[in-house]
C-alpha cells in the first residue's frame, strides 16, 4: 500500500463523515468510506429512503444514517468531515462556513485526490474548450507511453483510482468552477482556456465565478507550469496569479513564450527559451473549427517538454473530436446534421457557428443560466439562415436577435418548437440539399434533460430515425 493511500485511510477511519447528495461518485465513495471505518451520514433533499430507488437497499445494508427533507443540512452538525458535491451551490453561505468555523473539514472527492495523489497532475479549466483540451492532453501522454488517469469533470471519479496510481503515472483532470471554488491545492500543470460569463444562476456574481477559476493557479508549487489563453482578457489577467513558469496559447498573435498559429504558413508552433518549433500544419488538423485550433495549442503548450513532439503530431493529425462537439450525425436528402449539444453558452455556440463556411439552420434554446445573449445576436444574424428556438431561453435569444441592427426577418425566419422532436421537424422542413442543421443551444439542458449528453443523444436518435 502506498503511503498516500495510507494517509487517506488514517484521515477517514473512525470519523463522522457527511455526504451531500448521492450522485454517482458519492455512491462509490460512501461504500469505500464505510468499509474504511467511517460513520457516514447522507444529507439529501429526498424525503424518505424509498425515494433513493435501487440505492435504498445499499443505504440500509451499509447502515448509513440519513438527514433528509427540507432540513437535510442539519446533518452537518457534529461531523468531522463534510464531503461536498460540485452540484451543491452556496459554498460561502451558511451552513458550510458555520461547520468550518466549528472545526469540521469541508472537502470533496477531487480535493482529496489532489491532496493524496502520488503522481503529477495536469488540470484544465475554463468556460469553453475544457473537455477537448483535457482529452487531447490525455491522448498526448498515452501516445508517449505514459499511464493516464483521466477524471474530474470528465470520465470517472478519481479518488477510487488512488490505489492504482503510481508515482510515474500522470493524472489529467478537468475542473469546473463548482469543483474549484473550495480547492486549496493546484496541479503541477494548470491550463485556463478562457473565462466568459457562465453558471451565473449558481454563482453569486461573475467575480465569484472568476475567483473559483483562479484557484487552479493560486496554490501551485515550484516546479510548475501555467498555460493561459492570450486572446481572453480574463485568463490573460491571471498571469499575476502564476507561481512558476507561465506560457501563452494564442491563435491570433505571435508569441515568444508559448504555442501559437504562425500566420505566414499556418503552422502550429511552440516558442520557448528563444526557440520556435513548428510542430503541425493547420491543414493536417482533423478537428473542425478555429476554436479547436486554440484547444490544440493549449494542450500542446501544457505537455511541451513532457512528451515527444511526435506524440503531439500523431494525436493532432488524427484526433477527430469528442461526442457532442460539432459531431457529424448523418446526411439525409443532402442535408448534413451536426450535434453540438455542448453549446451550453453563447461563446460555445458562436465557436460552432464559425466552424462552417456557409449559413446554417440553427436549433437553440434551453435552460436559463442568466447569462447575456446580446453577444450571440450578431453571430446568429451573420451565420444562420433559419433559427429554431425552444426552451426557457428561446424568447430571450429571439429578443436579442431581433434587436440586432442587421437583423432582417425576410433573411432570417425565427420559429419556436415545443420540444426536440418538433425542433428537428421544423428545421428539416426549411432545409434544402446542401444545407447544414446544427443543434447548438447556447443554453444548458436542465429544463428538459438531466445534462447536455442526454440532450445530444436524443437529438441524434431523432435525426437517425428520420425517414
Protein language model regions, located:
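Short internal beta-strands
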Residues: 39-47, 227-230, 363-364, 383-392
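C-terminal helical cap/extension that packs against the catalytic core
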Residues: 56-57, 376-434
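Residue-level signal for inorganic ion chemistry
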Residues: 33, 82, 124, 153, ...
Amino acid at each position: 500500500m502506498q503511503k498516500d493511500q495510507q494517509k487517506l485511510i488514517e484521515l477517514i477511519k473512525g470519523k463522522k463523515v457527511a455526504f451531500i447528495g448521492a450522485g454517482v461518485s458519492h455512491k462509490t465513495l460512501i461504500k469505500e468510506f464505510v468499509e474504511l471505518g467511517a460513520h457516514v451520514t447522507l444529507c439529501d433533499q429526498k424525503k424518505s429512503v424509498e425515494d433513493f430507488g435501487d440505492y435504498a437497499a445499499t443505504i440500509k445494508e451499509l447502515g448509513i444514517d440519513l438527514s433528509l427533507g427540507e432540513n437535510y443540512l442539519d446533518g452537518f452538525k457534529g461531523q468531522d468531515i463534510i464531503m461536498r458535491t460540485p452540484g451543491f451551490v452556496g459554498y460561502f453561505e451558511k451552513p458550510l462556513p458555520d461547520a468550518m468555523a466549528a472545526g469540521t473539514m469541508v472537502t470533496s472527492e477531487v480535493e482529496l485526490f489532489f491532496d493524496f495523489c502520488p503522481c503529477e497532475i495536469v488540470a484544465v479549466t475554463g468556460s469553453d474548450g475544457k473537455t477537448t483540451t483535457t482529452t487531447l492532453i490525455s491522448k498526448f501522454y498515452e501516445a508517449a507511453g505514459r499511464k493516464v488517469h483521466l477524471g474530474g469533470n470528465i470520465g470517472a471519479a478519481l479518488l477510487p483510482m488512488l490505489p492504482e496510481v503510481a508515482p510515474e503515472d500522470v493524472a489529467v483532470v478537468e475542473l469546473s468552477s463548482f469543483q474549484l471554488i473550495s480547492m486549496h491545492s493546484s496541479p503541477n500543470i494548470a491550463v485556463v482556456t478562457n473565462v466568459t460569463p457562465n453558471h451565473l444562476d449558481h454563482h453569486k456574481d461573475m467575480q465569484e465565478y472568476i475567483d473559483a477559476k483562479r484557484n487552479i493557479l493560486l496554490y501551485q508549487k515550484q516546479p510548475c507550469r501555467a498555460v493561459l489563453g492570450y486572446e481572453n482578457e480574463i485568463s490573460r489577467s491571471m498571469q499575476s496569479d502564476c507561481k512558476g513558469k507561465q506560457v501563452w496559447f494564442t491563435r491570433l498573435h505571435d508569441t515568444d513564450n508559448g504555442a501559437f498559429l504562425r500566420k505566414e504558413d499556418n503552422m502550429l508552433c511552440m516558442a520557448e527559451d528563444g526557440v520556435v518549433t513548428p510542430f503541425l500544419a493547420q491543414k493536417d488538423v482533423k478537428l473542425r473549427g478555429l476554436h479547436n485550433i486554440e484547444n490544440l495549442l493549449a494542450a500542446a503548450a501544457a505537455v511541451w517538454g513532457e512528451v515527444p513532439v511526435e506524440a503531439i503530431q500523431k494525436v493532432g493529425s488524427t484526433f477527430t473530436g469528442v461526442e457532442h462537439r460539432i459531431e457529424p450525425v448523418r446526411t439525409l436528402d443532402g442535408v448534413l446534421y451536426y450535434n453540438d449539444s455542448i453549446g451550453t453558452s453563447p461563446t460555445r455556440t458562436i465557436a460552432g457557428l464559425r466552424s462552417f463556411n456557409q449559413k446554417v439552420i440553427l436549433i437553440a434554446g434551453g435552460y436559463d443560466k442568466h447569462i447575456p445573449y446580446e453577444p450571440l445576436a450578431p453571430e446568429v444574424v451573420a451565420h444562420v439562415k433559419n433559427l429554431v428556438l425552444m426552451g426557457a431561453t428561446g424568447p430571450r435569444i429571439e429578443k436579442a436577435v431581433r434587436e440586432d441592427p442587421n437583423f432582417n426577418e425576410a433573411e432570417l425566419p425565427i420559429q419556436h418548437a415545443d420540444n426536440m422532436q418538433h425542433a428537428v421537424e421544423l428545421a428539416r422542413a426549411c432545409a434544402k440539399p446542401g444545407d447544414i442543421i446544427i443543434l447548438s443551444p447556447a443554453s444548458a439542458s436542465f429544463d428538459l434533460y438531466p445534462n447536455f449528453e442526454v440532450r445530444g443523444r436524443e437529438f441524434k436518435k431523432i435525426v437517425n430515425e428520420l425517414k
